Design a protein with these regions (language model features):
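Interaction/scaffold regions that mediate signaling and macromolecular assembly across diverse proteins
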Residues: 2-157
Length: 157
């Protein structure tokens, strides 16, 4: 989506992006095939069955994963995706524990793409988080979702 933001200009909100059909109507050529960002994510990337991509993809919103400062390579993709999963899951903007209330707060990314994480790769969202979180989360904690902030992320200054 960064290419699209650069070429179309930076709107202030994702509502603005939707108005211009940014994710659904704007087409980019991928392998000689015109695809929208929505089609590329849902018809090309997600069918690969790799949930860690959700921690590497960035839609330019505040709640998106931080855009990696590396180019992913075929030789190191497994390690790179693990690093992004670990970084996202250990960032309290995306995953938080409330030990007093016994609640695991998760980014809505886990809600939007739940079927990519469970049951294909783990028995529960908590079990998936435990693969990367520095502090093991008890499996009996309730799961709540952190509201997604669709505000366009500002470039660091």
């Amino acid at each position: 989506s960064m290419f699209g933001v650069i070429s179309a200009g930076q709107p202030r909100t994702h509502a603005g992006l939707r108005k211009i059909g940014f994710f659904y109507l704007k087409k980019f050529t991928v392998g000689r095939r015109p695809l929208s960002l929505y089609s590329y994510e849902n018809d090309v990337i997600r069918p690969l069955g790799e949930p860690r991509v959700h921690f590497a993809l960035n839609c330019s919103a505040v709640s998106c994963p931080t855009l990696p400062n590396i180019a992913f390579t075929a030789q190191a993709i497994e390690q790179e995706l693990d690093n992004e999963a670990r970084r996202f899951i250990n960032d309290t903007r995306h995953v938080r524990l409330d030990t007093r209330e016994q609640v695991l707060y998760l980014s809505e990314i886990f809600k939007f793409y739940r079927e990519d994480f469970v049951p294909a790769h783990s028995a529960s969202l908590t079990a998936y988080v435990n693969r990367y979180h520095v502090t093991p989360v008890p499996l009996d904690y309730r799961v709540r979702f952190i509201a997604y902030d669709w505000t366009i992320a500002a470039a660091p200054r």
